[in-house]
């Protein structure tokens, strides 16, 4: 028998009255459940749960916790260092680390590889007949190319998009059979580097195409390339008329993918979406037989007609909301915690460095946390507006003033647990209560930007089951 509060249910939806009663019983006293559990459930640190039935909701297992399920497990499982036994078969967490040692680091960044794989599977299912490629550019949006590309390749992802040749080499090391496209295109004199790792450049101009064709022919190499066409973004790519004129002779250039990019897929009603899809359909007919790709993460949710032969899953893989006008359909991927290094007491009227006009209005306790803009925590666009927050103990607290290079200041005056705000303890900056999109909105940024800026001073933990 366990005391109240051992387990925490985080589901917003309870499917049936019986499920609600089962969860109430779980919260009240018992670590044993006779029957199936429909709710999403968190088993907290060093606690245990025995389910004599099926687990139909999602399950999070904290460090040191143990869960035994005698039936089937149909929900998503996030194992953060606990132990899971399903029908007498152990499912241990696979944990790898990177960066400085945890005791020496300013904070801890946990990256859930199981969630990334689940997000890819969800996007692939939504894309139906189209292949789902993974965009791992920018060091997998700051999350780490090798562990993420490796996990996705093992799951069945066959195609990856990277920023440059160094990133292509890193993907090739963990995905030896994958197709790899390099989005920054062909730099002069880099043909041999592409050939050595069997990667393909995304070609944006006749100049690049001519150099690539010369290299391929002179080296008698059958390497392919992607042709990128500008259908309305006005950034990179062949102008539409030039691409149409080039189509009759394109067969001899080894083009393996025709691609473009939607400019406003986050806004489903934007008229440019249908216009770009129509233009791309017309162009695809001229390049008959060559696979085509238009949709990025938001484009996958736009309409099936935007999917074509291949979709490019990027930010959504990492938990960023691809549908800003609706609830986030993706699983969260990261948890970021920072270390308290000092707790200050301020009298009314006192300020701190980088306070940008903030002053204590009452006797105030501030926790200084060793995370700052050098670690990628956002600073630009931030004014004192009560938007940036952190979780200290079980309470949501305001971050006051500007983040400095190495520090955040958090108002912990109202934290009731006297042990929560102590030097050495961790606070949550991104997690279940504060998503990456919440942090981005509060700092007038985007989820992609915040993720990509997360620095190398964190102790990184990659975990999966």
Where are these regions (language model features)?
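Active-site loop/helix belt of alpha/beta enzymes
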Residues: 138-151, 195-197, 209-224, 230-347
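Conserved beta-strand positions in the central sheet of alpha/beta enzyme cores
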Residues: 161, 181, 202-203, 259, ...
């Amino acid at each position: 028998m366990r005391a109240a509060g051992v387990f925490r249910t985080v589901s917003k939806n309870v499917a049936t009255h019986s499920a609600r009663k089962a969860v109430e019983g779980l919260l009240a006293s018992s670590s044993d459940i006779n029957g199936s559990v429909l709710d999403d459930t968190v088993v907290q640190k060093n606690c245990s749960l025995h389910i004599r039935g099926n687990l139909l909701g999602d399950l999070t297992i904290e460090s040191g916790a143990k869960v035994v399920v005698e039936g089937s497990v149909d929900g998503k499982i996030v194992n953060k260092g606990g132990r899971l036994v399903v029908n007498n078969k152990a499912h241990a967490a696979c944990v790898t680390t990177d960066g400085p040692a945890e005791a020496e680091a300013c904070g801890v960044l946990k990256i859930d590889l199981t969630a990334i794989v689940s997000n890819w599977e969800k996007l692939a299912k939504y894309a139906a007949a189209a292949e789902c490629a993974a965009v791992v550019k920018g060091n997998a949006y700051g999350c780490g190319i090798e562990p993420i590309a490796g996990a996705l390749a093992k799951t069945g992802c066959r195609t990856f998009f990277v920023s440059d040749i160094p990133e292509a080499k890193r993907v090739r090391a963990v995905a030896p059979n994958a197709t790899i496209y390099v989005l920054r295109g062909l730099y002069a004199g880099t043909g041999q580097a592409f050939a050595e790792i069997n990667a393909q450049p995304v070609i944006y101009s006749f100049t690049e195409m001519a150099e690539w064709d010369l290299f391929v022919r002179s080296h008698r190499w059958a390497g392919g390339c992607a042709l990128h066409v500008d259908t309305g973004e006005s950034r990179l790519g062949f102008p539409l008329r030039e691409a149409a004129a080039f189509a009759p002779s394109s067969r001899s250039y080894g083009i393996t993918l025709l691609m473009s990019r939607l400019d406003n897929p986050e806004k489903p009603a934007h008229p440019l979406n249908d216009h770009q899809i129509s233009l791309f359909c017309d162009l695809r007919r001229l390049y008959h037989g060559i696979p085509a790709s238009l949709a990025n993460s938001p484009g996958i949710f736009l309409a099936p007609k935007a999917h074509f032969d291949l979709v490019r899953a990027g930010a959504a893989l990492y938990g960023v909301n691809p549908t800003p006008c609706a609830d986030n359909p993706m699983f969260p991927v990261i948890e970021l915690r920072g270390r308290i290094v000092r707790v200050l007491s301020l009298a009314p009227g006192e300020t701190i460095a980088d306070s940008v006009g903030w002053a204590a209005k009452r006797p105030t306790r501030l926790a200084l946390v060793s995370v700052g803009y050098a670690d990628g925590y956002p600073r630009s666009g931030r004014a004192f507006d009560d938007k940036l927050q952190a979780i200290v103990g079980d309470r949501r607290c305001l971050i006051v003033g500007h983040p400095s290079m190495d520090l955040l200041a958090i108002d912990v005056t109202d934290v009731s647990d006297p042990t929560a705000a102590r030097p050495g303890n961790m606070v949550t900056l991104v997690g279940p209560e504060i998503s990456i999109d919440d942090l981005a909105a509060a700092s007038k940024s985007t989820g992609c930007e915040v993720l990509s800026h997360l620095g190398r001073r964190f102790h990184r933990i990659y975990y999966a089951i």
